[in-house]
Every structure is written in structure tokens, then in C-alpha cells.
């Protein structure tokens, strides 16, 4: 029911083709869109159609999602994995896409975030300052052991 009326199968397909063409989508996104369109019949059939016609490709989606969240939002591996799992993405695709993040770039991003956060924190006590930086990076989804290793290295 869209604006008080029901939509048919063909209309749902057309809307979802357009929806998937605008931006990379996963099954979870399409199911949510179907619910917003109030279209509850033949959902599996629609999703199978979109997959077979390459409108939905979970591997491609995972790779682009991972790359975007790391490059643009500066998320760490943990947060990216968590959000992909929330979308119901297969663990194989998650691991594959996370491994494609270059280790050097990952460390450089963490160091940049540490540097920016260090400048922003007014705290004089180095222990409290380091704890605040660590909390910030943990919220971004970076690994705790790597965080402390880099904080200790940068504070020397």
C-alpha cells in the first residue's frame, strides 16, 4: 500500500530495480523497502529475481560497504563486521572484504585519528587522555590491542 493503495508485483519489481540501481543494496535493505511499500507477497520471488539479474550481489555490496565505511567514516574492522552481520550478510563475504583493507592504510588511519583526538582533548593527565583516545577508537570499531599499542607508541 503506497499512499493508501496496494501495488502489484510488476510495480514492486520496477521500484526495486530502480532502488537497487541507485546504490548498492543487500537483501536486508530490499526486504525493508518491500515492507515500506507494504508489499508482503512473493518477497522471495522478487529477491530471487533481483539476485538473478544482478541487482543484488551480496559480495559486491559487502566489498563496497566495507570500503566506504573505512575510507569515509573511518570505521574499524569490528564495527564494519558488526553492521554487516546486522544486515544478515554471510560471514564469508564479511571476512573476505575486511581482509581487503590494506594493513598499512588501516594503521595510518588509526594514527591520524589518535593525532586528531589528542589535539582535541584538553585533559592534562596523560592516563586520562590516553583512556579517552582509546574509548574513541573503540567506538569507531578498532581492535583494543592495536589501539593501545599505537597509543603507547605515539605517547613516547
What are these regions (language model features)?
Residues 1-156:
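An alpha-helical, amphipathic repeat domain used for nucleic-acid recognition
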Amino acid at each position: 500500500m503506497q499512499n493508501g493503495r496496494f501495488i502489484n508485483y510488476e510495480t514492486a519489481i520496477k521500484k526495486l530495480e530502480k532502488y537497487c540501481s541507485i546504490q548498492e543494496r543487500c537483501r536486508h535493505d530490499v526486504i525493508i523497502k518491500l515492507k515500506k511499500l507494504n508489499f508482503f507477497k512473493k518477497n522471495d520471488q522478487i529477491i530471487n529475481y533481483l539476485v538473478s539479474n544482478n541487482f543484488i550481489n551480496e559480495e559486491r555490496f559487502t566489498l563496497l560497504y566495507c570500503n566506504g565505511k573505512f575510507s569515509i567514516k573511518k570505521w574499524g574492522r569490528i564495527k564494519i563486521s558488526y553492521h554487516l552481520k546486522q544486515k544478515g550478510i554471510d560471514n564469508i563475504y564479511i571476512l573476505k572484504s575486511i581482509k581487503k583493507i590494506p594493513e598499512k592504510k588501516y594503521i595510518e588511519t588509526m594514527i591520524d585519528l589518535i593525532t586528531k583526538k589528542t589535539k582535541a582533548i584538553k585533559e592534562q593527565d596523560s592516563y586520562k587522555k590516553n583512556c579517552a583516545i582509546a574509548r574513541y577508537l573503540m567506538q569507531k570499531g578498532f581492535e583494543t590491542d592495536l589501539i593501545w599499542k599505537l597509543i603507547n607508541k605515539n605517547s613516547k
